[in-house]
């Protein structure tokens, strides 16, 4: 279990660093044109391969990242953790939700990036980063952590959940409601927060706290 939570922590750190790099690339005037060039090409490609059944599928995927799906699942997960009295996982899950939701609005307002043209769905907020991608990743990965015990099986499903969240985020680009860089950034931040908080809490509970208690006990014994 120790190896798995540290591996998840390293994965979370890489994802968060990737998200920060994307934030910098979009913010920096010297690199934004290159990012936009990739985004424009991706958007044109998505528009060129639109096919009604695929649009329906993309809309279904996009729905999974919305509040009407995300929040009931989150509340159910928190109830399960509370019933099990798993306060460490509950605290980590709540912090992942709070920090991710706290990022979305300010970042969108800061970047004030317009949505792509030819969007299929109506949207009112700015484009960058994708709130659906962040929220979907936090929920998908968080549910795996809630429902499965620590171990190699959970780690495997965490990776699958991260991939699923990424596909769900990419569906937003097929509908032209987000640029590619929007959803890549959102997915990286969401996965990083969803994996990072539980890994940090488990490190403190299983490693740091026992070491601190052992040192405290040794110091007390040395004084007697």
Which residues fall in each region the model found?
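Transmembrane alpha-helix boundary/anchor motif
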Residues: 24-25, 33, 37, 98, ...
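Membrane-embedded catalytic cores of phosphoryl/pyrophosphoryl-handling enzymes
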Residues: 2-3, 119-224
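N-terminal export and membrane-targeting signals
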Residues: 2-16, 87-92, 152-159
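Membrane-interface loops
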Residues: 37, 72-75, 79-153, 161
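Short helix-capping/hinge motifs at transmembrane helix termini and TM-loop junctions
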Residues: 30-34, 66, 84-85, 111-112, ...
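N-terminal transmembrane-helix/juxtamembrane module of multi-pass inner/ER membrane proteins
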Residues: 1-69, 109-119
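Membrane-water interface at transmembrane helix exits
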Residues: 26-27, 43, 104-108, 112, ...
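Alpha-helical transmembrane segments of multi-pass membrane proteins, especially transporters
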Residues: 44, 92-97, 157, 186-187
